[in-house]
């Protein structure tokens, strides 16, 4: 009897994980079930299955408290018998992308340093639509909702351009850029006013680093 019950439990678990396999890369809402020294356990969906948030998927600016509701990015579903696991994240760039996609589906690229700053490039296929304005929302309502969900993380919303040099100039926002010159394959030099140099580089190089990741250029 015990063997039968064990088999039934294993079958139910396998079916549950199989149902979650198509949730990879999606946003889910859950409750924090458990907090230990390293990992965070998050209860997901109606079936109350456990998702695990590893240290590298947590953001330094957030405090995780049992019972809190939060949205997580489903990073990976590993279905391997007793070692089956659903890995979720609050640090993945995909989290910011999915939060905005609930309102604005035209996101081209995202670069992120969790808990500090995100840069997101957007575009619109309709020239009559202000893509940045649609993303920000009336009086900043949409972007503020995402910022609040991310615990105050700064978000730069940038208009994507097919011209890589124009895109680089926009990606260095909030600094103004005088010119961008290509110096090699996927490499360029941006010239900024002297009084904007520190803004273009950012604290500990963060702004320049995020711009490079966003554009794929260095």
Regions found by a protein language model. Name each.
Residues 1-218:
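RNA-contacting regions in translation and RNA-metabolism proteins
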